């Protein structure tokens, strides 16, 4: 029996394939978040102010994100080009701006550092998923071969 295929983003895909890609994106996201939180709280424990700590921790997370999402989540086979890297950086700069703003706002509203960081992370992850899925790696999704 063959799997039901749907036409999505210019090609036919199985629901299993879509769930697998989303699962991989989420797995990479968890890894990015652990790196982000680990670096952030390590730096703040060393008395680095929370805003510079955010810049450093977020940067560590985006480097991890690019490598894993490109090679594992979206299975990009073509050589990385400047356009893709610039798009990735633009999305991450925008997401970083959102996390920075949310962290600042929640901290200045009296929320705990953990609640502030969680809220900022959720906002940044939403921006990141949408941008990477549609704009950065979107063309690659049309070329993924069934891995069944």
Curated annotation (Swiss-Prot):
It comes from the Bacteria. GO terms for biological process: polysaccharide biosynthetic process. Pfam families: GtrA_DPMS_TM. The keyword Cell membrane applies. One of its GO terms (cellular component) is plasma membrane. InterPro entries: GtrA_CellWall_Glycosyl (IPR051401), GtrA_DPMS_TM (IPR007267). It is a multi-pass membrane protein. It is found in: Cell membrane. The chain crosses the membrane at residues 25-45, 85-105, 118-138. Keywords: Cell membrane, Membrane, Transmembrane, Transmembrane helix. Belongs to the GtrA family. This is Uncharacterized membrane protein YngA. It comes from Bacillus subtilis (strain 168). The lineage of its organism: Bacteria, Bacillati, Bacillota, Bacilli, Bacillales.
């Amino acid at each position: 029996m063959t799997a039901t295929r749907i036409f999505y983003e210019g090609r036919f895909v199985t629901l299993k394939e879509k769930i697998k890609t989303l699962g991989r994106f989420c797995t990479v996201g968890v890894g990015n978040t652990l790196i982000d939180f680990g670096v952030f709280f390590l730096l703040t424990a060393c008395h680095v102010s929370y805003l510079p700590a955010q810049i450093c921790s977020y940067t560590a997370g985006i480097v991890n994100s690019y490598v894993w999402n490109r090679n594992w989540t979206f299975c990009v086979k073509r050589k990385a080009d400047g356009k893709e890297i610039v798009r990735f950086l633009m999305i991450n700069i925008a997401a970083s701006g959102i996390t920075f703003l949310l962290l600042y706002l929640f901290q200045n509203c009296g929320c705990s550092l953990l609640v502030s960081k969680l809220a900022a992370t959720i906002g940044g992850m939403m921006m990141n998923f949408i941008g990477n899925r549609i704009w950065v790696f979107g063309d690659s999704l049309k070329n993924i071969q069934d891995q069944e």
